[in-house]
Amino acid sequence: DEFARSLGKKGDSRDIDSYVHKESKDGGVRVLSLLRPLKHPESIRPLLSVLDVAKAGLLEIGALDAPVGEAMGALGCSGISTGRVVIAPRDGEWIDPGQVRVMLDQAGLSEWDIMEDDIDEHETREWLFGVQDELSKSSPDVTSSSLILPVDQHFNVKGVGLVAIGYVQSGSLSKHDEVEVLPASDVGVVRSLQVMDDDVEVAFSGDRVGVALRNLREQSLHRGCMICVPGDGALVGHESSSFDLELAPFQRKELSIGDVVHAASDLQFTVGRVSGLEGSSVVVDWDSPLWIRGDGSSRVLIVQLDAVPMRVMGRASNFQKTG
């Protein structure tokens, strides 16, 4: 928390702490948004939720233990190829940077840097801004894609009404747009939008946005529900799915028929049971619909909660609806 506070102003906090840093430069405003999962390793869901929206990583290491290995494996599975490890040994600990490098390479994080000694928060912020700029240049134009906005939290605000908060994963959202909330299939209208505490007319891909909604039942909102454009087919509901499973780094366990698993994707955490296995091909029947992007761009991690110390089984690819 101390390291994160040095990089940005602490905002809302539940099972994820958020930090924001704004500064003026060249006549404009630059913004960094940082998320820090809490309760890990006791609970893995906050870490997975952060990875659903993260573009780069900062991993502070106080000791080389199983939770660090799990975090590295999850980062590798999520394709977070840009990042830094900050070595900050706990009292009495000594951490070998060479061993950290070996673990990073094994986790698929070979491009990550390792930082030791006193960390300069100004240099770290400049590095993060640089990463942000590079990612914006190299990323495809997701603003022109269909709207996908997973909801992280929601509440009622006096004088405003129902507000949903989440990250715009693709597309854009404007005031007065008609939207649909899945899986409830309820339709409402955007009353107003806030990004970084500022009222805006449009929220774009990558923005953490507060969406005030009217003509919508509060019961239709919950963590992991999706806001999209009615009828555009951006998301497909899966009652059961087949996929290829690429085992996570450091994962020694294999799935068996009947195993209970969770799928983590776009802030969803959907439980299911393995009903078919053939080599690396897996079939899972979901307890409730798992919403997958129609264009095939969903990033899905398969998790087994009792597979400690490495609960991330791996990354699913070639996702197909079987029911």
What does each of the following model-derived ranges do?
Residues 107, 112-220:
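Conserved catalytic-core segments of large NTP-driven translation/proteostasis enzymes
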Residues 56, 173, 178, 208, ...:
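Residue-level marker of beta-strand positions
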Residues 50, 172, 202-204, 220, ...:
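Residue-level "contact hotspot" at macromolecular interaction interfaces
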Residues 5-63:
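Switch I (G2) and immediately adjacent beta-strands of P-loop GTPase domains
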Residues 1-16, 66-67, 77, 81-114, ...:
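C-terminal effector modules of nucleic-acid-centric enzymes and ribosome-associated factors
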Residues 26-29, 38-39, 202-227, 254:
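Conserved mixed alpha/beta catalytic, RNA-binding, or beta-rich assembly cores of soluble enzyme
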Residues 50-51, 55, 68-69, 76:
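ATP/nucleotide-binding catalytic cores
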Residues 42-46, 67-74:
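Well-ordered alpha-helical segments embedded in enzymatic catalytic cores
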